[in-house]
């Protein structure tokens, strides 16, 4: 018969463990061995460092990104949210630890029959503790820790996005400056052409149509100059915002004039690893994962709310009718109590609360799976863009050189009276257009590499 209480104890513990098991679905991620469009890339482990943008070898870009990281307000907000989550963890834990309070009271009662005033003085410290028997503390702590990790990865995401935006804006700025330089150079050459045609016209060697055509070419190039000047100013203002600077402060810093965007361009070698790497590298995927962990903890708390709770309370102090006797031994009192509370009927509120928490968990599970698919798509898109742009750049480099030779030879033929001026116009337009397109392709290829680094998760662990 003595074994019966022991057996009942084992059964009770087993039921407690079973009742706390929340049985949640696991993510189903479709893994692939390699990227579909990554055949021309190294499949070694990803080795992008924390300062991944340094691979471009541009000191101005390095300085801009470092300044943005140090001053950008969104970075500061994200860092503050990490600290907020850390404080919330302490608050969460404290809710499941004993609480101690103290009370001091003075009472007076007047008896009208005897006309006496009875006084009482009390000092009663109290302690109470709701025992987390069914995992409520564990689930609450798990949820709070997941919130910290979520904010850490959110910080990583904000930082990576900032780094990529600064790099993209910088190469866009270089592109506009190159376009402006081409427009100015073309305008100068066309102005010289107008001077020549005007001279030939005055001596009867060129028609008025030729002169008007030469002027139209000049006006076309000159019309592009203010457009690129405007684009440069707008890009600089965008960079100022990313830097956390006022426009005036940022403009005083200055960004060196550079044509390195074409002169120093070369294909960059980036190891892309395997698709599963994005699961632990991408900030958005990891943030979605920890959101899922928070949801799981919320389900656990909702389940715990449906189970019995045990509260222990203790109070001890002094109660007396005379203030000078407050600290005498005769006035000391103590009380200890334990209570067990089991929710019985609340119109299904607790059960529906758990079911609602489970639905939120499923929503976040699907969001996590979707974030993985989107990460794969981002990498594949960047790989396609880089691969196709490589071939396009090679063709356009040859095309620009061909149009340059055509323009030189056509102009020489025209001066010798062996070609019509329309041929000169066509050659000039083709050269101008091909130069612009080539500069844009080079800038876009830099941005493609930026997008690939961002898609792979950038420099994890900052």
Feature map (PLM): residue ranges:
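Bacterial N-terminal signal peptides that target proteins for export
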Residues: 1-8
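A small-residue-enriched
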Residues: 20-36, 66-132, 230, 236-251, ...
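Regulatory alphaC helix of protein kinase catalytic domains
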Residues: 40-67
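Coil residues (strongly favoring Ser/Thr
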Residues: 45, 59, 88, 112, ...
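Sec/SRP-type N-terminal targeting helices
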Residues: 76-77, 93-94, 131-159, 209, ...
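Periplasmic alpha-helical coiled-coil/stalk elements that build and connect Gram-negative outer-membrane
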Residues: 146, 153-274, 385, 412, ...
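Short segments within alpha-helical structural elements
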Residues: 191, 220-248, 302, 397-456
């Amino acid at each position: 018969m003595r074994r019966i209480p022991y057996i009942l104890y084992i059964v009770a513990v087993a039921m407690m463990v079973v009742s706390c098991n929340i049985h949640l679905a696991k993510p189903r991620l479709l893994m692939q061995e390699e990227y579909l469009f990554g055949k021309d890339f190294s499949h070694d482990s990803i080795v992008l460092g924390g300062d991944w943008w340094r691979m471009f070898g541009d000191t101005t870009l390095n300085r801009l990104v470092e300044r943005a990281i140090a001053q950008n307000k969104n970075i500061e907000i994200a860092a503050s949210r990490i600290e907020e989550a850390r404080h919330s963890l302490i608050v969460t834990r404290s809710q499941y630890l004993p609480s101690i309070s103290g009370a001091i009271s003075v009472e007076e009662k007047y008896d009208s029959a005897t006309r006496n005033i009875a006084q009482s003085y009390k000092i009663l410290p109290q302690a109470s503790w709701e025992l987390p028997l069914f995992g409520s503390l564990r689930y609450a702590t798990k949820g709070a820790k997941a919130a910290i990790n979520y904010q850490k990865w959110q910080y990583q995401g904000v930082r990576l996005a900032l780094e990529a935006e600064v790099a993209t804006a910088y190469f866009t700025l270089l592109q506009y400056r190159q376009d402006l330089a081409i427009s100015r150079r073309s305008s100068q050459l066309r102005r010289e052409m107008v001077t020549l045609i005007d001279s030939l016209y005055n001596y009867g060697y060129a028609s008025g149509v030729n002169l008007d055509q030469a002027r139209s070419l000049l006006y076309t190039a000159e019309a592009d100059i203010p457009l690129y000047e405007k684009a440069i100013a707008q890009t600089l203002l965008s960079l100022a915002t990313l830097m956390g600077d006022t426009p005036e402060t940022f403009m005083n810093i200055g960004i060196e004039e550079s044509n390195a965007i074409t002169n120093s361009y070369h294909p960059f070698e980036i190891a892309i690893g395997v698709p599963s790497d994005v699961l632990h590298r991408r900030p958005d995927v990891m943030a979605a994962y920890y959101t899922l962990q928070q949801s799981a903890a919320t389900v656990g708390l909702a389940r715990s709310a449906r189970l019995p709770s045990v509260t222990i309370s203790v109070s001890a102090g002094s109660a007396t009718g005379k203030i000078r006797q407050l600290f005498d031994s005769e006035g000391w009192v103590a009380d200890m109590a334990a209570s067990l509370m089991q929710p019985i009927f609340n119109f299904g509120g607790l059960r529906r609360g758990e079911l609602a928490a489970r639905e939120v968990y499923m929503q976040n599970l699907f969001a996590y799976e979707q974030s993985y698919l989107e990460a794969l798509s981002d990498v594949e898109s960047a790989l396609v863009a880089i691969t196709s742009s490589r071939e396009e750049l090679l063709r356009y480099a040859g095309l620009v050189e061909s149009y340059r030779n055509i323009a030189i030879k056509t102009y020489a033929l025209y001066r010798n009276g062996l070609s019509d001026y329309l041929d000169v116009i066509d050659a000039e337009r083709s050269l101008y257009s091909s130069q612009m397109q080539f500069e844009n392709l080079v800038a876009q290829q830099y941005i493609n590499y930026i997008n690939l680094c961002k898609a792979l998760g950038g420099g994890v662990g900052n």
